[in-house]
């Protein structure tokens, strides 16, 4: 068999700019090099790994009030907590600095960009990636968030120039072809949000499916796509709810699922799980963690009581205290999230 390294050597001698390597040895990665938690165990569990991937794109889709921006801030705060660099492109001009600080974001070390157009957004992301990787170490975590891709108009729109049908999708598709490879080689987590769009469903019965700007282009480039939908509100006073339940649906993922060659039963699409979202603080970590532990049978439930191993049973409202008493609960949760959906 011919030596593939000899082919690489000849390419280098010819001054080729083509990124190429043999197998896993090189800058091109087939799998993420790490993960940044969303601080919502339910979402991490849906992803199948302990957070959004470093070296890939994550897409969060949801209407106004579905918690996308809060989850973005959680990811940025988590990246900073691990010593990484956080960057946010605020295309809608709705970044709330007080809320970001409340959720743990270090504003003194947060890079904020506010592009005027969609073209500026993508050009800025590419420039930030190159600048950040040059300024930071090779192993430093970098998380870039675009909130949202639907918030920035195209340059022609700002000048009231008539555009071709689907011009935004064409631009997004072209830019994502470049960005998906760039974030992969630079080990960067790129998180993008988008909003659902109405589509006329002529000649069909029932509720039309959910669609969003850049659906095909971003969906193809993303390692993980999650749809967030607001459900029933909760609170002691129905007239003044303090939060609502969020239904999270895993539309697609390329980083989790069954790896058994002969298995034909496991699915990695359309997983749906619900978590509590408080308007003041975002996803409730403790109830979300308990739900994941219960689903994986690490914690048993009977008659309103939860039980972990041989410890004394407890109520759901006592779980936050029990995590302090039983540190192994967090270790168990961490093992579940590292292992994905399957035992």
Walk through the language-model features, giving the residues of each:
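Short acidic/His/Gly/Ser-rich catalytic and metal-binding motifs that mark active-site loops
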Residues: 97-98, 151-158, 200-202
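The Walker A/P-loop phosphate-binding site
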Residues: 2-109, 121-127
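Short acidic-hydrophobic, aromatic-tinged amphipathic segments that line or gate anion-handling sites
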Residues: 110-116
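Phosphate-binding/switch region of NTP-binding enzymes
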Residues: 165-296
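Residue-level preference for the first positions of well-ordered beta-strands
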Residues: 57-59, 85, 141-143, 189-191
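Long, well-ordered amphipathic alpha-helical subdomains in the mid-to-C-terminal portions
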Residues: 284-314
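Terminal-proximal interaction/regulatory segments of ATP-powered molecular machines
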Residues: 304-343
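Phosphate-binding/switch loop-helix module in NTP-utilizing enzymes
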Residues: 116-187
